UniProtKB/Swiss-Prot annotation:
Protein's UniProt keywords contain Repressor: no
Posttranslational mods: 4'-phosphopantetheine is transferred from CoA to a specific serine of apo-ACP by AcpS. This modification is essential for activity because fatty acids are bound in thioester linkage to the sulfhydryl of the prosthetic group.
Top-level taxon of the source organism: Bacteria
BP-aspect Gene Ontology terms: lipid A biosynthetic process
Chain positions with O-(pantetheine 4'-phosphoryl)serine modification: S38
Cell compartments where the protein resides: Cytoplasm
GO terms for MF: acyl binding; acyl carrier activity
Keywords: Cytoplasm, Fatty acid biosynthesis, Fatty acid metabolism, Lipid biosynthesis, Lipid metabolism, Phosphopantetheine, Phosphoprotein
Organism: Prochlorococcus marinus (strain MIT 9301)
UniProt name for this protein: Acyl carrier protein
Family to which the UniProt record says this protein belongs: Belongs to the acyl carrier protein (ACP) family.
Length: 79
């Protein structure tokens, strides 16, 4: 797992969900651990798409439940 991507994702998640950066770990679940609702999740996906200049299809977004899932998806898209 790329440390650079992980740190950037954690920063975006912290900002989007208004949680302390220290609370965001690679295994943090957006809804269960960080209190995101469905709208938060949509906004988070949009922020990740913009930050990494990628497109996350709805089907893929549904499978991204944790910070680590997001990092893995971004790494695969960025090659």
């Amino acid at each position: 797992m790329s440390q650079e991507i992980l740190e950037k994702v954690c920063s975006i998640v912290s900002e989007q969900l208004s949680v302390e950066a220290g609370e965001v770990k690679s295994d943090s679940n957006f809804q269960n651990d960080l209190g995101a609702d469905s709208l938060d999740t949509v906004e988070l996906v949009m922020a990740l798409e913009e930050a990494f200049d990628i497109e996350i299809p709805d089907e893929a977004a549904e499978g991204i439940a944790t910070v680590g899932d997001a990092v893995k998806f971004i790494e695969e898209k960025k090659g």
